[in-house]
A protein has these predicted regions:
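Sequence/structural signature of beta-propeller domains
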Residues: 1-265
Length: 265
């Protein structure tokens, strides 16, 4: 169970991180331990589930009072230190926390158009990839539409921002994954999952050039309602390294879907 913010009655989790370092220690009710899973929520909280009680996450960050809306979460190591990165969609910023859950940095892209804010986030090959989506009036949810989106790349400390993709093939982009060398037509491509229309677009990971979109066996562009996470297996416990797994909130996020995509050419 993921706890609600102070005074709340429920939580809406978004980003999830698995952490094997044990450095993100959470404590409550006499229990303490390194979080195995960490969760960000649209309620403005970050929680962790320690090994001693995996079924009950413990609140570590609560920024609900300031209106924070976390849409994504990632983790990375700089030297011997571990950090969390949360995309605060409401406040148009990426928040960087150390292993003690102290806020150590905030950053964003000042050059995106007004009302665009960090949405999805993932560490790929030692770089921080961040998607940007358009905010709705309340700055709580995205405003979907063709070409509504950007993808940036940052160093792990938030510096050296570089725009990789602008608009083309994007529609409230959230999921990110780098394809392996044996994923058919889109081998070695950066894949971006669009929450807005359920399409998965492929780009050159260096130049950002648009390469196309994933299609089904009949040549039709794949559409996955409510598409969220996309990730490849690790070749061992989480499945084949060239199988793309996905999660989705189908039927306007009232149900969940977990599936897989395999390249046939």
């Amino acid at each position: 169970m993921i706890p609600p913010p102070a005074g709340g009655s429920g939580s809406a989790p978004t980003g999830t991180v698995f952490d094997s370092t044990g450095q993100f220690v959470v404590s409550a009710n006499g229990l303490s331990g390194g979080a195995i899973f960490l969760f960000a929520t649209e309620d403005g909280t970050i929680s962790g589930s320690p090994a001693v009680d995996l079924n009950n996450a413990i609140l570590a960050v609560d920024n609900s009072a300031s209106g924070a809306v976390y849409k994504g979460l990632a983790s990375a190591q700089i030297g011997s230190a571990n950090f969390l990165y949360a995309t605060n969609f409401h406040d148009n910023t990426i928040e960087m926390y150390d292993s003690g859950f102290n806020l150590v940095n905030t950053f964003s892209d000042p050059n995106v158009p007004p009302r665009y804010a960090p949405f999805g986030i993932r560490v790929i090959d030692g770089k921080l990839y961040v998607t940007f989506a358009e905010q709705n009036k309340e700055k709580h949810d995205d405003k979907a539409g063709p070409n509504h989106g950007f993808v940036d790349v940052f160093d792990l400390d938030g510096s050296n921002r570089r725009r990789l993709v602008s608009r083309h093939g994007l529609n409230s982009p959230w999921g990110l994954a780098l394809a392996p060398a044996n994923f058919g037509k889109f081998s070695n491509a950066l894949l971006v999952g669009n929450f807005g229309n359920g399409h998965i677009s492929a780009y050159d990971p260096n130049s950002g050039a648009f390469l196309g979109q994933l299609q089904d066996q009949n040549g039709q562009v794949l559409t996955i309602d409510g598409l969220w996470t996309i990730t490849f297996g690790n070749g061992v416990s989480t499945g084949p390294a060239n199988t793309l797994f996905f999660t989705a909130g189908i039927d306007d996020e009232s149900h969940g879907l977990f599936g897989r995509l395999d390249a046939i050419q």
